[in-house]
Amino acid sequence: MRFIADFHIHSRYSRATSRDMELEALALWGKKKGITLLGTGDFTHPTYFAEMRSKLEPVNEGIYELKHGERETKFILTVEVSNIFSQGGKLRKVHTLIFAPNLSAVEGINDKLRSLGKLGSDGRPIFGFSAKELVKIVLDISSECLVVPAHVWTPWFSVFGANSGFDSLEECFEEEVKHIFAIETGLSSDPEMNWRLSMLDKITLISNSDAHSPNRLGREANVFECPLDYREIIGAIRDKDPRKFLFTIEFFPQEGKYHFDGHRNCGVVFSPLQTKANDYLCPVCKKRLTIGVMHRIDEMADRAEGFIPSKSIPSIHLIPLEEIIAESLGVGVGTKAVDGEYERLIRAGGSEFAVILDLPPEELKRFASPKVLEGIIRMRQGKIHIVPGHDGVYGKISILSPKDSGEGEVSREQMSLF
């Protein structure tokens, strides 16, 4: 079966996360979005894990659903872990995503990690040992677990981050690198940017929302064609199998909040070339700029932009439906007008991904307004305008601009959508 999966999310037990991020609401929003499989997130948190054990039941190997309530959305057991440690004479901060095959394995992981740090303070626990040690701990408990470095290019808290990361997976994980089969590209990079590094050719690139609120689910995701089974899914990722792992769904990376360099408080947004021309200093405050993902990839890349390696998993770039609606109405996301139109469109179209990804224009025309339809078509064609994100500020996207060219435009044909 073909299905969409978003593995990296957070529960209400993580900091700065909506109280609505609980299993029942996640299942309902998964159906709205058209996401068949959601990561649970935060399985190390004691209270949340107790909820999982009481509310979920297995339906396939390593796949769960609610005992009561919305059952179309399935769950796979996941957590993000933060490791802050010294290695190679530097302070390192690395976030990692863990997949577990069953609740018994999660219990074993939690028992071990509980002896090494606090699990109840945050749904994303923080530990003082290395990322390499985390791999050893997890795989000693279950060899069926999968460990994936998370949002690998963000300046802070990532394996390749400009401020506290490494220059290769081998440098970070040392002898345990043989167990690293995949990385998460993060919102501020996409597969095309990662293809510029030959050292990642054998690594599978996955994409997830890292959602902290229900409406953010699926802003990045993965599309599979395989049985809804833990071993099948993990096998497709490990093997980088294009017959089973069809493509990833991406944010336009310019919209990510660490894409370009800059200083948010000074209103400075620089490309890597502009940063170098200014000696890495902010022209306003004269302090060092926050170096973004594009700059870091430029530093590490050994290929030019546009290179496509063999056996790569393709990707498409989408914009959340609520953002398209908001621009068509000239109001903000989260307003009653946008929320009402969003609900109407997904009722008519079946789900958000059906509307923005699957349905052909002639079918959308039956229930979508002309402006929303134009926005969806322009998005599918890549004809949009973006002011790149920087220093923790999301980029600003414009779909319905009357301009067809100019600075900040992204214009490219994407793979066929229907």
Each PLM stretch: what is its role?
Residues 15-18, 49-53, 157-164, 195, ...:
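Histidine/acidic-residue-rich catalytic or RNA/ligand-binding cores of hydrolases
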Residues 325-418:
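Low-complexity, acidic/Ser/Thr- and charged residue-rich accessory regions of DNA metabolism proteins
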Residues 1-91, 384-385, 397, 417:
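An N-terminally biased module of ancient metal coordination in phosphate/nucleic-acid-related enzymes
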Residues 8-12, 151, 212:
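Histidine-centered divalent metal-coordination motifs
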Residues 245-313:
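Cys/His-rich short segments
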Residues 8, 42, 147, 183, ...:
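Conserved, mostly hydrophobic/aromatic
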Residues 202-218:
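Short acidic/histidine-rich active-site segments
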Residues 2, 50-181:
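Extended substrate/RNA-proximal surfaces in nucleic-acid metabolism proteins
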